[in-house]
Amino acid sequence: MRLCVALDMASKDENLALVRELKGLDLWLKVGLRSYLRDGAKFIEELKGAGEFKIFLDLKLYDIPNTMADAAEVVSKIGVDMINLHASAGERAMKTVMERLNALQNRPLVLAVSALTSFSESEFEAVYNDTLSRSVRKFSQMSFEAGLDGMVCSVFESKLIKEVTNQNFITLCPGVRPFGESAGDQKRVANLVSAKQEDSDFIVVGRPIYENENPREICERILEQI
């Protein structure tokens, strides 16, 4: 299991200060929509220069097939190691993206978002008119058939996803509160024990790290346990 630190702080300077503090640790960095819109591709370059970190660009692409493929190609060429898109864009859109990216010399890992971890079961059903578990199963199979590398999902969906695809299909799980911290705006949260039991490949941790007085110490504690 790998640790991915969410760079969701209020400014680029704060994010870079955190990254410098974590230099030398074996982890990934997640750049979300706010940080990317505010700080741009140059921020990715700065992160690459701050240490030997791999970068997950979390933009959750969602559009018509060719537009998604165009966008995926652009972000792939700035040197990130993982990107994502919404599975609900459909299998044709996902296949179009993968056909485009497989033509590149070095493409990033591509994951599909099943259901945002901010959704409760009832909220998900109100939007998608289906149960969460049935939709996750369907989205996972579609993504696997389209040639993607894995899914962004809650810890509690990780085993199900691997059962309907295969054990090498990556699961990246946000909403992890390593030591029982506040859930914040997440609904489907889990701790480290659950993440390990459910065979999660990546866990994403943000606030419990950057809101702590000693972010490096927390990261080291997490890395020791995973």
Swiss-Prot record:
It catalyses: orotidine 5'-phosphate + H(+) = UMP + CO2. It comes from the Bacteria. Pathway: Pyrimidine metabolism; UMP biosynthesis via de novo pathway; UMP from orotate: step 2/2. Keywords: Decarboxylase, Lyase, Pyrimidine biosynthesis. InterPro entries: Aldolase_TIM, OMPdecase, OMPdecase_AS, OMPdecase_bac, OMPdeCOase_dom, RibuloseP-bd_barrel. Gene3D superfamilies: Aldolase class I. Homodimer. This is Orotidine 5'-phosphate decarboxylase. It comes from Campylobacter concisus (strain 13826). The gene is pyrF.
